[in-house]
Design a protein with these regions (language model features):
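Catalytic core of non-heme Fe(II) oxygenases with the double-stranded beta-helix
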Residues: 127-194, 235-241
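Short edge-strand/loop segments of extracellular domains
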Residues: 119-121, 169-175, 227-232
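Non-heme Fe(II)-dependent double-stranded beta-helix
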Residues: 1-19, 25-137, 142-143
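A conserved mid-domain beta-alpha-beta active-site/ligand-binding segment of alpha/beta enzyme cores
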Residues: 187, 192-198, 254, 258-259, ...
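Non-heme Fe(II)/2-oxoglutarate
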Residues: 208-209, 213-318
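A structural signal for short, well-ordered beta-strand segments
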Residues: 113-115, 152-154, 224-228
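Conserved metal-binding segment of the jelly-roll/cupin
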Residues: 196-210
Length: 318
């Protein structure tokens, strides 16, 4: 254990199971944000070499001179970042640490980290190359595991509407694709673009569809991403003290005499996204329920009978 932590509650975990992310606006203190930006360093946006290779060389030069550390894949998070550094302080904040432990456990492993930059318009003009948004993608490769990684998206400075904040599509994390097979989809119903105060942190399931936007300002936009792997089964790692027997009970469906409680676990798991279709959207309810079963360690859980119905295989008794 690195520090005290404030773990997620069951409603927050159900929201993560449904949306694939939890967002904490302005949660990182300004002194950490300032130190991180100083450690990251600045990129040279002056005139110089033209062509797309200029971007690669500029980013390589920044990484070479940055004070941000290299981390070997598989390093335990507890030891990856020194306590006296901005990143070390960030991952030890009680709320951040609690969220991490709730999702991937107390001894999670650093898969990798990377500094993502959205360069200003002037940079592309000087290089003589067009400015494009990043394609929509699902990170890494086809990943059929029930276990999941999380990615911390850290925005150390304010991100305005014109800065090309990361766009993401909530609820896509359980729809597995081959990384860039969705690249042609640039605008999807329900997608969100990050506009946020300094110190915003978004914790995403590794499967959420996302991509970087175009920065139309005169300043570089910074976003630092850390991918974390679990090292233990991700079963009931959060604060489960608010779970009650009611959270495991079936409720009337379709014909109801009373409105359902939107804060019920079943309601959170069956809350549609704008991109859901009337029929195939129901497959996402099934995916979410099965995901929640994994998190609970309870293969009998169901919400509104969606999974029980399709698993019903009566067998003859002798």
């Amino acid at each position: 254990m690195m520090s005290d932590c404030v773990k997620l509650n069951s409603r927050e975990m159900a929201e993560f199971a449904a949306d694939g992310l939890l967002r904490f606006d302005g949660i990182i203190p300004n002194e950490i944000n300032r130190q991180f930006l100083a450690d990251a360093g600045s990129i040279d946006t002056s005139n110089g070499e033209k062509g797309s290779n200029r971007t690669v060389k500029s980013l390589g030069n920044l990484m070479g001179h940055s004070k941000l550390p290299e981390v070997t894949p598989g390093t335990v998070l507890n030891t990856a970042y020194k306590e006296t550094t901005a990143l070390g302080e960030l991952v030890r904040l009680p709320v951040v640490r609690g969220a991490i432990e709730s999702l991937v456990g107390p001894e999670s492993l650093v898969d990798h980290h990377f500094l993502h930059l959205a360069l200003p318009t002037s940079y592309y003009k000087a290089a003589g190359i067009p400015q494009r948004s990043q394609h929509t993608h699902q990170d890494s490769t086809i990943d059929p595991r029930r276990a999941f990684d999380i990615q911390l998206f850290y925005f150390p400075h304010e991100v305005g509407l014109d800065m090309g904040g990361t766009r993401y599509v909530p609820g896509t994390h359980l729809r597995i694709v081959s990384e860039s097979a969705i690249a042609r989809y640039q605008n999807i119903r329900g997608q969100q673009h990050v506009v946020c105060p300094a110190g915003t942190l978004i914790l995403m399931h590794h499967g959420v569809w996302h991509g970087g936007g175009i920065n139309r300002t005169g300043d570089a936009r910074y976003m630092f991403k850390i991918r974390l792997n679990p090292s233990i089964p991700q079963v009931r790692l959060w604060d489960t003290s608010d779970l009650s027997a009611r959270d495991f009970e079936q409720r009337p469906i379709f014909f109801r005499k009373e409105a359902t409680n939107p804060d019920d676990i079943a309601s959170l798991l069956t809350r549609p996204q704008p991109w859901f279709e009337g029929d195939t959207g129901r497959l996402e309810y099934i995916n979410r329920i099965r995901f929640w079963r994994y998190l609970l360690g309870d293969e009998n859980f169901d919400a509104d009978y969606w999974v029980t119905r399709i698993e019903n295989e009566p067998s003859a008794t002798v």
